[in-house]
Amino acid sequence: MSHRYIPLTEKDKQEMLETIGANSIEELFGDVPKEILLDRELDIPNGEDETTLLKRLSRIAKKNITKEDYTSFLGAGVYDHYTPAVVDAMISRSEFYTAYTPYQPEISQGELQAIFEFQTLICELTGMDVANSSMYDGITAFAEACILAFSQTKKNKIVVSKGLHYQALQVLHTYSKIRNDYEIVEVDLDGTVTDLEKLEDAIDDETAAVAVQYPNFYGSIEDLEKIKSLIKNKKTLFIVYTNPLSLGLLTPPGDFGADIVVGDTQPFGIPAQFGGPHCGFFATTKKLMRKVPGRLVGQTEDDHGNRGFVLTLQAREQHIRRDKATSNICSNQALNALASSIAMSALGKQGLQDIAVQNFENANYAKNQFKDAGIEVLPGTSFNEFVIKLDKPVKEVNDKLLEEGIIGGFDLSEVNEEFGQAMLIAVTELRTKDEIDTFVKKVGEING
């Protein structure tokens, strides 16, 4: 019987050697120079039985600080949200348990339909015409949107708000290096929102796109209507990076005339874990449909008139025309897209709206509590994040909060020195009034 982790027994090895006419492993690799062969056993521990191994791994895992054991007010792009129990139950089914888009639609109708439903839900949330089957994460989806703008408009300049997630800006600058003539212009903030006067000055006839985040990285809700009005040249695209949960409460970017809407569905059924995996989405207009990166699932009919699903418009993709492909995306996040689809479906339209309202109300309750405690809260209309100013270094405050069982907010001094000692705080539907009150009290005591 084979070992459960090592498929070859000594008997198996001997039979294989006899089949190929070798007497030993050493003879099999006889052509490898002896001077590069290791002549001793590897300096690693011996194997352990399953019980001992599980105990060891459990001890290691307990060293981690998790949101299950602590109260978290950390966001900055990854949030502590409720995940319906049905999500894990459904995505664990063997027929769904893959991250790949199926290339054989005739035998993958269930998976393709699930992706089609994901695309439909994203379109309904964003107010756009078309959405792709998913991307690696929201930040790479944003960078791909900017590359599309360069390609579509034949212009080489993109104007972006500094209110975008700092990692989105970093990735965009990396992507822009594929061409020496791509220009990225970053527009300063006025407080915690984009400075509209500076934005207007930065936009000209050579601008391929204007990009903002809604709500932005600092938690404030940008005025998309005014920003759209500044884009006078119809050939300049309007790109919006958004939190999809916020669209349960906020007006969809599509209603303001956005050309491309991107984001990350992590708030819907995807745990906050290390660096991912996440699930980016990319939604746009029919006009730009043939420029969309990644996979698109379309609905069709078979010869008998039955509804079916296929990968459509594949001529955009690198496995069809590598030299003319719209991107180098070769896979996606099908499993996480399914998780998000199930979460959205389980919540329903009303449930999604209710959770969005809870985020808004909890965050604004926390803001008022901080103000009452004499702690400065930076102005701006918030969805579920906001910024406070502290007298002490944020790292010092967070370290002491951790001792109290609280994961504090994001230290903005690490990414934007202009804010000084400022903490970005996220308050989701999972935070109770008592937890918020305790957090505010502890921050006040530590800050002195």
Swiss-Prot record:
Annotated GO MF terms: glycine dehydrogenase (decarboxylating) activity
Recorded catalytic reaction(s): these are: N(6)-[(R)-lipoyl]-L-lysyl-[glycine-cleavage complex H protein] + glycine + H(+) = N(6)-[(R)-S(8)-aminomethyldihydrolipoyl]-L-lysyl-[glycine-cleavage complex H protein] + CO2
The domain of life for this entry's organism is: Bacteria
Q: What is its EC number?
A: 1.4.4.2
Q: Which UniProt keywords apply?
A: Oxidoreductase
InterPro entries in the record: GcvPA (IPR023010), GDC-P_N (IPR049315), GDC_P (IPR020581), PyrdxlP-dep_Trfase (IPR015424), PyrdxlP-dep_Trfase_major (IPR015421), PyrdxlP-dep_Trfase_small (IPR015422)
Give the top-level enzyme category.
oxidoreductase
Among the GO biological process terms of this entry, one is: nucleoside metabolic process
Query: CDD domains per the record?
Result: GDC-P
Self-association state and partner proteins as the record states: The glycine cleavage system is composed of four proteins: P, T, L and H. In this organism, the P 'protein' is a heterodimer of two subunits.
Name the HAMAP family for this protein.
GcvPA (MF_00712)
According to its UniProt entry, the function of this protein is described as: The glycine cleavage system catalyzes the degradation of glycine. The P protein binds the alpha-amino group of glycine through its pyridoxal phosphate cofactor; CO(2) is released and the remaining methylamine moiety is then transferred to the lipoamide cofactor of the H protein.
| NCBIfam families found in the cross-reference section | PRK00451.1 (NF001696)
For this chain, the family text in UniProt reads: Belongs to the GcvP family. N-terminal subunit subfamily.
**Protein known as:** Probable glycine dehydrogenase (decarboxylating) subunit 1
Name its species: Staphylococcus carnosus (strain TM300)
Taxonomic lineage of this organism?
Answer: Bacteria, Bacillati, Bacillota, Bacilli, Bacillales
Q: Which gene encodes it?
A: gcvPA
